[in-house]
Amino acid sequence: MLKTSITAFALLAMVSGCADVPQATEPAPASAPLKITSWNVEHLAERNGEGCRPRTDADYADLRRHADALAADVIALQEVESKAAAERVFDPARYDVVMSARPKGRRGGVCYGKPGQTIGHQAVGFAIRKGIRWTRNDDLSALALGNPDLRWGVDVTIGSRQPVRLLAVHLKSGCNSGRSQSDPDCPVLFDQLPVLERWIDGRAAAGETFLVLGDWNRRIAARGDVFYAEIDDNEPAGADLSIASEGQAAGCKARYREFIDHIVLGSKALTRMLPGSFEEYRYDQPEDRHPSDHCPVSIRIKP
């Protein structure tokens, strides 16, 4: 699909709810809606051949192609080894990259199902298009629960006239539904819940416009999800949350029809989201050649 302007691309996304790979476009002008994206880049390493998803120069070039086609203004990143790794995909001449300050963990070990490959550091961060005003707030280190192998949240504010607070997260994996006490992952995820809720409640109490986005490792849009119900309580006022996908089915992988990557908006942020602008980016490659095991998800908000 050819896109002749940012406006046309935005209108098409609002109608379709998903996006195939478009041609790369120029950044949006200051008055245009901002495209806010979350992308788990799957074990993105600094150097070729390392980590649980060892890559070649051609693989990094393919990721850059998709990053250009995505044409996002702000991208929350997950599973990125370092700033240097992110800058192999997001050109530092075009993007400011900020990564969590979490020290590299001691986890190491062999990648699951991949003998001889060693897991690398997984950090959360942002790539922010140059020209967008932003400030960094303290990382939400409490999400790690004192465990050096759990990820921190990264907290930035974009814009100045009508600022938006963004928290990028990558929550504990392995508890995508329910609350089984026999599953060792569920108690950890639910210990992260009050940390996340305190951040949300703090933003709502301060009257801020905020989003929480990233890899939640949880099907929070499922009917009656107990994790989401606990944070979506509208206490204090303004903490009434909305999930941007609005019940749409995921299409990145044939086996999985429910999202675990989410953009969650507070009530003030929802008023600035362009209706129908949620989209799941689709790679123009067979699933076994996808450059990551997650597809980016995006919305557009009024600046």
Tell where the protein language model's regions lie, with residue ranges.
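Positively charged n-region of N-terminal signal peptides that target proteins for export
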Residues: 1-4, 215
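Bacterial N-terminal signal peptides
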Residues: 5-16
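N-terminal, active-site-proximal structural segment of metallo-dependent hydrolase catalytic domains
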Residues: 18-121, 194-197, 284-287, 293, ...
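Metal-dependent phosphoester-hydrolase catalytic domains
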Residues: 19-22, 146-148, 198-211, 217-303
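Beta-strand-turn-beta hairpins that frame and shape the catalytic cleft
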Residues: 28-36, 131-134, 148-177, 303
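Solvent-exposed loop/turn segments at secondary-structure junctions
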Residues: 41-45, 80-84, 102-106, 132-134, ...
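Short acidic, glycine/proline-rich loop/turn micro-motifs
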Residues: 47-50, 177-182
